[in-house]
Amino acid sequence: IDIETASDENIKDCGVYRYAESECFDLLLVSYAVDNGPVATCDIANGETLPDDVRNALTDKTVIKKAFHVNFERICLSVYLRRKYPEMFDFKDSTGSYLDPVSWQCDMIHCRYLGMLSSLDDMGRLLRLKEKKMAEGKELIRFFCTLHQEADGSILFHDKSDAPKKWEKFKAYNRRDVEVELKIQRYLSEFPVPEFVWEEFYIDQEINDRGILVDT
């Protein structure tokens, strides 16, 4: 699974939790493949919704979800689903505000466990994939995912109506990321990560989800 999002927060400065909790945060695109099948893209920003089976799979602990740097997908999808479907969450403590990490696996961690590279782009080049991450992605993310000041002084996000052709390319970029991830996963599957490493990862994620109490 791979997503595209927008927020007024700079994720490099504040991290994914503050980024996703912003009132301006929005989920734009979701691309996914089920059991190595064809890639589907949901244009959330333009009224499409996740199919019920996909939404249910996100909360089903028996269904393994994979992404490259999965913490981003898990937290952002948690916030999106929590706002639209609060009944899906158990708010007994802060960890209940997020999708349970035990059914999520991170391809970046898998790569690093094998002593390989930690970016999707670098892994595509390393494995000499014919179709790699699209180079236009950074410019498209700047255009659609960050705030812009217009000539009249207003500050807003660009959307499909501002550049329809760019939006279609943005969707293709999102879809391509999943296609590249699937090819990388086929290679990684020959060298599985031991279960104890995933257990350590789940503990790490729970620690981050719980956070710390701070007097203000």
Regions found by a protein language model. Name each.
Residues 1, 28-30, 210-212:
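Structural beta-strand/beta-sheet cores of well-ordered domains, especially the beta-sheet scaffolds
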Residues 1-2, 104-105, 214:
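Short hydrophobic beta-strand that contains or immediately precedes a catalytic carboxylate
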Residues 1-25:
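Entry/capping segment at the start of metal-dependent catalytic domains
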Residues 25-27, 32, 36-189:
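Active-site-proximal helix-loop-helix substrate-binding element of RNase H-like nuclease domains
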Residues 196-216:
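Extended, well-ordered alpha-helical scaffold/bundle regions in very large, multi-domain proteins
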